[in-house]
Regions:
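Mature N-terminal segment immediately following signal peptide/propeptide cleavage
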Residues: 1-18
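Short, well-ordered coil/turn segments that N-cap beta-strands
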Residues: 9, 41, 71-75, 131-132, ...
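Enzymes and membrane/adaptor proteins characterized by extended Gly/Ser/Thr/Asp/Glu-rich
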Residues: 16-24, 34-162, 184, 189-203, ...
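Alpha-helical scaffolding within the catalytic cores
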Residues: 25-32, 211-218
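Phosphate/pyrophosphate-binding betaalpha-module
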Residues: 165-166, 170-182, 212-225
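Extracellular glycoside hydrolase catalytic/binding regions
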Residues: 202-211
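Mid-to-C-terminal alpha-helical segments outside catalytic/metal-binding sites
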Residues: 315-338
Length: 338
């Protein structure tokens, strides 16, 4: 792979980021040409992209073929399908699928089997449509009862319950060859603020996080999680500054990889969110995420700027090609098993 191809693999974008179209609902010649020019690592789809079963199947099948033809690897075809509040497929009413409901309800039941069944149900219909990656489960421990961001999405306030149920959802998805992304490291359940809008932080120390928020992620790592999402949450009492976890070498390289022993793929939360765009350009944020140890940059506000920014950073020595190669190796290792 050329440097340009390797860097392209580090990005997971909406189809509209590479094809000049309002809302992508098909993948034809324009998509093929765009992938040939910049073979990105994958795509993330939202409800507007998803109109009917046949339409989604055709679109994703074409994208997969273009990607394989261009670079010899499948694309990550992803969606946010947690169930309930966040369900890009089930919430539309356009698909004959079961909405499994909010994870808070399943958590309150205390029945791990329900979580496994939810994962199987979601995995079944996502796989049928052509998706191979789901931004779920939500592994956040709801330790701040005033947190409305993940209130319905979290399995609750008991780290053991969240841990067991997150794993069960992931296992259910895996039965249908759908990879899961545990989110939002280091835990969105204790935070004040909403990263979609702007700055959000936890005032916990590392020891405090280890006793609660990090437990589900430790369990995921012990069970060979392939993907963990790093959130745009600042943890000033851990890192000593306001850098979001998604851009923090302390959080990703030192803690998640070093102390917790994780060697899977780290994907950032969406880089078009306020917590990032208020502070950084698309290029700065992408470079900073990779310097921190992330592997996949999700949805930069301006993809072309972010992509060029990473290429420039390698060329001027800000990023080493070895750092790029480490991430590409992790990505390819998962893709060859898809």
């Amino acid at each position: 792979m050329s440097l340009e191809e390797k860097v392209a693999q580090l990005f997971l974008v909406q189809p509209e980021a590479i094809v000049d179209i309002g809302t992508a609902t098909a993948a034809g010649d324009a998509t093929k040409q765009a992938i040939n020019k910049t073979p990105v690592g994958g795509f993330v789809y939202f409800s507007d992209n998803l109109q009917s079963e046949q339409q989604v199947q055709d679109m994703l099948r074409n994208v997969q073929k273009y990607s394989e033809d261009r670079i010899g690897l499948p694309a990550f075809l992803s969606v946010d399908e947690e169930g309930g509040t966040v369900a890009r497929v089930a919430s539309t009413g356009r698909f004959d699928v079961t909405d499994v409901g909010d994870m808070a309800k399943i958590g309150a039941s205390g029945d791990v089997q329900q979580a496994k069944q939810a994962g199987e149900t979601i995995g079944s219909y996502l796989s049928e449509l052509g998706f191979n990656l789901d931004f779920a489960p939500d592994a956040d421990v709801l330790t701040n009862p005033d947190n409305t961001v993940v209130k319905k999405r979290s399995f609750g306030s008991d780290p053991r319950v969240v841990s067991d149920m997150s794993l069960a959802v992931a296992q259910g998805l895996a039965q249908h060859q759908v990879y899961s992304v545990y989110k939002h490291f280091p835990g969105h359940g204790a935070t004040v603020g909403d990263t979609h809008q702007g700055y959000a932080y936890t005032d916990k120390t590392l020891d405090e996080l280890k006793q609660s928020e990090l437990i589900p992620f430790e369990n995921a790592i012990q069970n060979n999680a392939a993907f963990i999402m790093a959130a745009h949450i600042s943890a000033p009492r851990v890192t000593g500054d306001d850098t979001p976890a998604s851009l923090s070498k302390t959080m990703i390289t030192d803690i998640l990889r070093g102390q917790m022993g994780y060697d899977g793929i780290v994907v950032t939360d969406a880089m078009n969110m306020g917590a990032v765009t208020e502070q950084y350009t698309s290029a700065q944020a992408a470079v900073k995420a990779l310097q921190a140890g992330a592997d996949v940059v999700l949805m930069p506000e301006d993809f072309q700027e972010a992509y060029q920014g990473v290429l420039d950073a390698v060329k001027d020595g800000t990023l080493t090609e070895q750092r790029i190669n480490e991430s590409v190796t992790r990505i390819v290792t998962v893709k060859v098993h898809m």
